[in-house]
Amino acid sequence: MATKLRLESTSPFQGLPELVARDEGLFAAEGLDVEFVKRGADAPTKVDRSITDPDMVSAFASHGSAEQVGGAAMFNACEWGNYRRVEDSQTGSQQVGRRAIIAFGALMVAPDSDIYTPQQMANKVVGVPYHAGTHYLALLMLEGFIPRDSIKTCLAPNGSRNRLDALLNGEIDATTLTEPYITIAERKGCRMIVAAPYHGTEVASEEMDAPTYAAFNRAVREAVKRINADKRKYLQYFIDAHKSDPDVAALTVGDLNPSRLQVVDPAPIPAEELQRTYDWMHGWGMLKTIAVTDLVDDQRQLAGQQA
């Protein structure tokens, strides 16, 4: 009898290997009956320039919202946001390892913007989805060019389509996007100011035991192998996931940049990287009291990598 595993819903830019593992029977081959459950009913849907501090909104508005009420055993999201979610968790959930996909995010401006370089971003309002990956990515990318006190952000909606619309409508000076909306934005004449790849992690409740996590990772590793063998085939997922959007439906795989799709085997979070990320988040005041040793369930992390 298959083991039932409920995961929070995901998108290709952050969870392509899991989607491939589901669609190609890789989870089933490991004895897992995987169900993706909805999340994010309370996620922001519009820009709010009066909200300029991530502490003003919940870290669980989208990612983790189902897990926190017992609806899912595990979810993946950006590594930084998951540090904060572990600190804020009411269920004792912890990180159990890094996810397979390396997400790609870009900070972009509208075609008529007078901003051409990161240095020109000082005191410009960047709309970001607080506690999601490109929120933190924007800070990391910009602080290499301008002082921290010159980086200005406000709350922007979840979903790159919503943020792109806000950018084109002039509601914000810049925003962050993921694929396929980086490509859509470029086709509309928007400019990429700075971009980078970034890691994510898996956060699990106590419901997720080590053998189940190991089986999950075995399926994901096979999906990684298949994606890396034929990226163009799997880039179609980025179109299909958003095909209700006419702009995306008009794309072909040839329009997407395969270098922005990177997947690796899921793995433990290296201790030195864990510490650096922890220190960086403390430096921004985005972690409060949690100890670095409480961020990860080391036992499940190691056991979950068993072949």
Residue positions per predicted region:
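Short secondary-structure capping/turn micro-motifs that flank functional sites
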Residues: 37-38, 43-44, 73-76, 183-184, ...
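Short, low-complexity disordered leader/linker segments with a strong preference
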Residues: 1-2, 307
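Conserved C-terminal helix/tail region of periplasmic/extracytoplasmic solute-binding proteins
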Residues: 279-307
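Secondary-structure end/capping motifs
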Residues: 210-288
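Short, glycine-/small- and polar/acidic-enriched structural segments
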Residues: 2-153, 173-176, 194-195
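Pocket-lining segment of extracytoplasmic ligand-binding domains
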Residues: 154-242
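Ligand-binding pocket scaffold of soluble enzyme catalytic domains
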Residues: 36-38, 158-164, 251, 255
